[in-house]
Curated annotation (Swiss-Prot):
The active site is at E144. Removes the formyl group from the N-terminal Met of newly synthesized proteins. Requires at least a dipeptide for an efficient rate of reaction. N-terminal L-methionine is a prerequisite for activity but the enzyme has broad specificity at other positions. It catalyses: N-terminal N-formyl-L-methionyl-[peptide] + H2O = N-terminal L-methionyl-[peptide] + formate. Fe cation binds at C101, H143, H147. One of its GO terms (molecular function) is peptide deformylase activity. This is Peptide deformylase 2. The keyword Metal-binding applies. Gene3D superfamilies: Peptide deformylase (3.90.45.10). GO terms for biological process: co-translational protein modification; translation. Signal peptide: none annotated. It comes from Pseudomonas putida (strain ATCC 47054 / DSM 6125 / CFBP 8728 / NCIMB 11950 / KT2440). Its cofactor is Fe(2+).
Length: 178
């Protein structure tokens, strides 16, 4: 089922999400939420989605793609379901990059993010996940996990000369919503 995506200004996006409780692991309810999130993400051409964006207060993010029309120059990111994540930078190197968000439609901005990270958490059955990521993969993970602490990417922008409407900044980029 395609779910509605909350938009910036909805106070539910500002909440800190609690961890997915142990009793939900492996449940049909959790699997339905994950299936709905993937269907929703694909429907709008996104590269990631966090449960709070669909109004569910849980530490759950999904991300991954082979090729993205929204980010045509980005390298592929493996499809991942990540619960109760922890992100640790593995170097102090920070990289600026353009970001958009399904909850901030039609806009893009340059956001600084750690270039190299380790992310940990669990999968829907409770098995541990421990991965290293860099570049766009690291950016996507950090962006999605920000939603779990009630943070949207515009709050991380340092130069508002590099923030605006996608259609103005990137004419001809075909995206249904940004």
């Amino acid at each position: 089922m395609i779910r509605d995506i909350l938009k910036m200004g909805d106070e539910r996006l500002l909440r800190i999400a609690p961890p997915v409780p142990e009793h939900m692991l492996g449940s049909a309810e959790l699997q339905q939420l994950i299936d709905d999130m993937f269907e929703t993400m694909r429907h709008v051409g996104g590269v990631g989605l966090a449960a709070p964006q669909v109004g569910i207060d849980l530490q759950l993010v999904i991300f991954g793609f082979e090729r993205s029309e929204r980010y045509p120059d980005a390298e592929a990111v493996p499809q991942t379901i990540l619960l109760n994540p922890v992100i640790t930078p593995t170097s102090s190197e920070v990289e600026d990059g353009w970001e958009g968000c399904l909850s901030v439609p039609g806009l893009r901005g340059v956001v600084p993010r750690f270039k190299h990270i380790c992310y940990q958490g669990i999968d829907p059955q409770g098995s541990p996940i421990n991965r290293f990521a860099d570049g766009f993969h690291a950016r996507v993970v950090q962006h999605e996990c920000d939603h779990l602490i009630g943070r949207l990417y515009p709050s991380r922008i340092q130069d508002f000369a590099k923030f605006g409407y996608t259609e103005v900044l990137f004419p001809g980029l075909e995206v249904s919503e940004d």
